A protein has these predicted regions:
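Divalent cation-coordinating acidic motifs and surrounding scaffolds
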Residues: 1-344
Length: 344
């Protein structure tokens, strides 16, 4: 089974759906639209997400979060970009649910309203990590303008900024989320995790709909974005061919479409990444994490094939599907996933 014990490092991905710690003032949200106002704390979303991390995901050593909003939620034009309060509230909720005290890390956007998503929210990726189990490699944290690069750290892969964003100034990420990379040490081994939230599939038409060929919204953007992350992995492997790299997040893509083939390296035959669903042979019926136009893609955590032993997405550990009828207010638009890696 999968658990944060002994030599097994556990890594999870969780889209937390515009999580923020405040009840917005309707006068300060986009178009003064009451639909932009929410109360994630009062509605129990922090507690529910924390409970899933503790019980369903069994307190992973590292949790990659997507759609973390800033401290003022959807309020606009207030100069707020940090998500320290949002992450702090989630860390406390996990403690209240019986979990460990995680350390949260993020790189806030350099300029407000440049990451897309709900106006004012400035969504970004972040990591939670259990410092009792893993160590964030010492270094300089990047800013929203800094681009982190793999570098040689005594024979293993380090990062020029840790944590850091990957090419935040590249036009491929204009109006979209920038990949967040972080390097950790576990049991004397280095692991680099890349947390993504690629451009949405907005504007898509159903695969089997009346419009053929179907429209895959923003596919061109995702092709460019995945190529950049693929190059980052290539650069890491050029430093250490046996590097432990995990690429996870909300890919907003079907596994059979070109952007994820580019990400994995299938288009250039480098094949640097493998889909964990394929590596572990998880049943096809369990490979759903999201319902889009009647189809069930996955956020697709990926691993470098050289990563040791048997990484395995936790089908049995995953919480109930967020769109099940007994959950009228989804805590996440995606099914969270966790994976285990034997690192002796």
């Amino acid at each position: 089974g999968i658990g944060s014990t002994g030599n097994q490092l556990t890594v999870a991905t969780y889209n937390v759906l515009n999580l923020d710690p405040v009840v917005e003032n309707v006068a300060n949200v986009d178009d003064m639209d009451a639909g932009e106002v929410d109360d994630d704390a009062g509605d129990g979303r922090f507690a529910a997400i924390a409970n899933q991390i503790v019980t369903a995901l069994a307190t992973p050593d590292i949790v990659g979060l997507q759609e973390v909003q800033d401290n003022s939620g959807a309020e606009i034009n207030d100069g707020v970009v940090s998500a320290s309060d949002t992450l702090g509230a989630l860390v406390q909720a996990i403690v209240d649910a019986g979990g460990p005290t995680y350390t949260a890390i993020e790189v806030a956007p350099a300029v407000a309203e440049t990451n897309g998503g709900q106006p004012g929210g400035n969504i970004r990726q972040a990591f939670l990590y259990n410092a009792a189990r893993v160590t964030l490699v010492a270094g300089t944290a990047g800013t929203g303008n800094d681009s982190t690069l793999p570098q040689n750290d005594a024979g293993v892969v380090g990062l020029s900024f840790n944590p850091g964003l990957i090419e935040p100034g590249n036009t491929a990420f204009a109006g979209a989320r920038k990949p967040l990379a972080a390097a950790f040490d576990f049991n004397g081994q280095r692991i680099v995790v890349v947390n993504n939230h690629f451009s949405s599939k907005g504007g898509s038409t159903p695969i089997n709909g009346a419009i053929q060929p179907f429209v895959n919204g923003s596919e061109g953007e995702r092709r460019a974005q995945t190529a950049i992350v693929n190059q980052f992995v290539d650069d890491a492997l050029a430093i250490d061919a046996n590097a432990n790299v995990v690429v996870l997040g909300d890919m907003n893509e079907f596994t059979f479409e070109e952007p994820l083939q580019i990400l994995a390296g299938a288009d250039d035959s480098s094949n640097v990444l493998s889909d964990l669903f394929d590596v572990t042979g998880l049943d096809q019926l369990e490979r759903y994490t999201f319902i889009f136009n009647g189809n069930s893609p996955a956020p697709d955590p990926l691993s470098v094939p050289a990563a040791p032993a048997t990484p395995s997405p936790a089908g049995a550990l995953s919480p109930p599907h967020p769109h099940s009828p007994n959950r009228p207010v989804p805590h996440s638009p995606h099914r969270p996933l966790t994976s285990g890696y034997e690192l002796p």
